[in-house]
Amino acid sequence: MLHSKSACFCHILFILLFMKLLSPVISSIARLRKWRIDNWINHPVAAQREVLQHLVTSAQYTEFGRKYSFHKLFNVKEFKAVVPIHEYEDLKPYIERMMQGEENILWNEPVYWFAKSSGTSCDKSKFIPVSDESLQYNHYKANKDVLSNYYKYFPSSDLLTGKGLVVGGSHQISKVNDQVQYGDLSAVLIQNSPFWGQWLRTPELSIALLDEWETKIEKLALATADEVVTSIAGVPTW
């Protein structure tokens, strides 16, 4: 028992020292994004136009893009005049086809993951397409930008000297077919997170994605009791 506690203490000490050494490096890299974030803040309209143009250009050869002649849309005014506001029920037929494996419907990349909402309207769950590009350049890049902005104001922070306690929803991943899956958004994000995200978080996936809340809390507490936790994060859709 004594040997086990000693080994655990040494393990924690090693991680703490390692992260202490690595923290300045990571924080310096994170601050490199500062100029980009500042540019968005100083030129918000131009930034939004850039995003819109990227989306329209990328989706111009999809079924949805061809329907509304995306290849002819070059500014916000034209887009608003041609593309009507769509509610979920309007997009549902497209999404259902995507979930069956059809490609080039709403987006120009294959979509293998769908986030299932908790059903805030009409008491029905909605399925939101989550493309790989959305994961990489929306969700995960946003994490980096939040980190970058944090270090802008707290450059000497010890945030990265420990791990982030991840509190997510339940996994409950369901398969539509061999390639397409859907589940809680937090589970989709955790399941597809890059290696650096997995390295900096706790607890392990089997606990973080448990369905039963009381069981999850108990196991989470036991699993992280000896961890160095410096932050709490999650995408709680409940």
What are these regions (language model features)?
Residues 8-10:
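Cysteine-centered motifs
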Residues 18-47, 52-238:
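Active-site phosphate/ATP/adenylate-binding loop shared across adenylate-forming ligases
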